[in-house]
């Protein structure tokens, strides 16, 4: 059994929005009892991941917000937050152009009001991501603005555009985790399906992909499996 197992959630463990099985939770608890570490690495916020994995929440590491935050046993192991001046600048640009801007905080997402931009404290919590509601509009002006700040696009679909600190990614968080628990690349297994997983998949040759993985991910080389949850349950 690997000392450290790191898995993406959406598209990897969660493919058809089916709840994870009791056998999976039992496996993670057994892995922890043997001194192993399991980390879930996702673009989702910490509070969502904790609810999904509440049965094992005290035994696993949560890497949330595309690597911007890492939590273990309710303690912060690592974070790379959005700088307040950058958050204000991007949110101001978004509001000026008619977009809704949302700040992803540790425990909640909070919409930004224009009057907040003039306040010195702005938000009373760390900002891990800035989420823009696209409403079918072109967001190139916001992407251009981000390039002048310490921000990068970490996720985009037809409805949302998300920014995080340009140095925040899953790979950097996993590196910190490896250092903390003295794990080398041969003792680690990483599972993922999308381009935002490449930074952590590149840290080891022990890579597993679901069948639906993006071609850029498959090109890294690794094992392709039909069901990631079943694969983890059956690990020896």
Regions found by a protein language model. Give the residues of each.
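Non-catalytic pre-domain segments flanking phosphatase-related domains
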Residues: 1-7, 23-26, 179-183
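Asp-based, Mg2+/Mn2+-dependent phosphohydrolase catalytic module
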Residues: 184, 203-236
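Hydrophobic/aromatic beta-strand patches that form the interior of the parallel beta-sheet core
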Residues: 39, 63, 189-191, 208, ...
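Active-site metal-binding loops of divalent metal-dependent hydrolases
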Residues: 9, 44, 193-194
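Asp-based phosphoryl-transfer active-site loop
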Residues: 2-18, 201
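Conserved acidic, metal-coordinating active-site core of Asp-based
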Residues: 93, 97-203, 212
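Phosphate- and divalent-cation-binding pockets in alpha/beta enzyme and binding domains
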Residues: 23, 48-51, 141, 173, ...
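Active-site phosphate-binding/coordination module
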Residues: 16-113
């Amino acid at each position: 059994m690997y000392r450290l197992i790191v898995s993406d959630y959406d598209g990897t463990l969660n493919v058809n929005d089916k709840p994870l099985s009791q056998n999976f939770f039992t496996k993670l608890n057994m892995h922890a009892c043997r001194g192993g570490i399991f980390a879930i690495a996702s673009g989702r916020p910490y509070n969502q991941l904790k609810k999904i994995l509440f049965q094992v929440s005290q035994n696993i590491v949560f890497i949330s917000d595309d690597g911007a935050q890492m939590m273990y046993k309710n303690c912060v192991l690592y974070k790379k937050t959005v700088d307040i001046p950058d958050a204000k600048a991007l949110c101001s640009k978004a509001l000026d152009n008619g977009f809704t801007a949302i700040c992803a905080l540790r425990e909640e997402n909070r919409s930004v009001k224009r009057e907040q931009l003039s306040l010195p404290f702005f938000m009373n919590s760390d900002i891990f991501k800035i989420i823009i509601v696209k409403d079918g509009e072109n967001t190139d002006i916001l992407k251009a603005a981000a390039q002048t700040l310490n921000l990068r696009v970490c996720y985009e679909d037809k409805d949302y555009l998300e920014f995080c600190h340009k140095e925040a990614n899953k790979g950097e968080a996993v590196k910190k985790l490896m250092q903390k628990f003295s794990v080398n690349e041969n003792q680690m297994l990483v599972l993922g399906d999308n381009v935002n997983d490449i930074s952590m998949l590149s840290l080891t040759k022990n890579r597993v992909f679901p069948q639906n993985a993006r071609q850029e991910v498959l090109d890294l080389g690794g094992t392709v499996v039909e069901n990631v949850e079943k694969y983890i349950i059956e690990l020896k």
